[in-house]
Each structure stands twice: as structure tokens, then as C-alpha cells.
């Protein structure tokens, strides 16, 4: 708590609200609205859109974000099946790679293949760890279920996966080491 108190105080002084994050409504709207395709639509962000930046400056951050959240919630209520379909797409993009997000478009399929392969191996490792009742496996399950959930509602980006990649790496190493044991190729370290 001592680490975040200065940030809470800063936000209260600057924004009038003691919050850790204040931009959820704007992010929700970027991912949900007319033309939404499950990806980050940067052209709707105030830093990329002159009209949105003007609104942001006129209203202030808290009012702007609240307005964008109302727009997103209205869209979700109006077409909930579409929102669910977008959430499913974002789930696929989070674990399989976001399309068209490479600076070199020809590399995007390769990049996404590696992204997807690492996810499949991590899920496989998690499944094996749970079946074998490995200590801590349930913690990894809850991490993998809970951490990315918000990105299924807004939009995925490869950097949003970085915080859990060490755990995914552990699961990948686990499944590979289990495969080595099964083949009889285990060596003494």
C-alpha cells in the first residue's frame, strides 16, 4: 500500500479521484463500438485523433473517460451477441497473436505462429501439471484465467501478455521436460 499511496494522492490532487487507473472507459470504447473488429483501433484514441483529443481537453480526463464508457456500455447492451463474438475474437488474438500488428507485414504470420505455439505448449504444460497435481499448478491456472480477462472485453495487444510470459515459460519448460522423461531421455543434471 505504501508503494501506491503517492500515485493515489497524485490522482486525487490532479483528477479529483483517488484511482489507480482512470482510462478503462476509454479503452472499453476503443474496443467496442461501430466498426469494432476485436483489435486496438488506434484512430479512436485521443493521441491519434484530433477530434477526440479536443473532447478530452474540453471535458477533462475523468469526464471524457466516463462519456466514452457510457458509449461502450450502450453499444454492448444494444448488441450483446456481437460483444460476445468480439470477446471470443479477442481471446483468440490474445493467445494466438493479433493480426496485422507487425511492422513488417510479411512477418506477421510467423510471429503469430510462434505466439500461438507458445500458448499451446503452455496450456499443455498447465494441463499436465494439473493432472499430475503439481504444487502451484492451481495458482498458474487462476493466473491464466484471471489476468487476461479484461483484455477479452477491451482489446488485446502483444505487450499485454508480457507480465505472464515468465509463468508461460515455466509451463512450456515443464511440458518439454515431461516429454523428455516420457521418451526416457532424462539426463542427470
Language model features with spans:
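Membrane-proximal stem/loop segments at transmembrane-domain junctions that anchor or position
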Residues: 12-89
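Transmembrane-helix signature of polytopic, lipid-linked glycan biosynthesis machinery
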Residues: 5-9, 96, 125-129, 143-158
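Signature aromatic-anchored transmembrane alpha helix within multi-pass, membrane-resident enzymes
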Residues: 1-5, 137-141, 170, 175-189
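Hydrophobic/aromatic-rich transmembrane helices and adjacent perimembrane loops
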Residues: 113-116, 150, 156-177
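Internal alpha-helical transmembrane segments
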Residues: 1-17
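Transmembrane alpha-helices and membrane-interface helical segments
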Residues: 121-129, 144-145, 165-182
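Membrane-interface anchor segments at the N-terminal boundary of transmembrane helices
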Residues: 68, 74-140
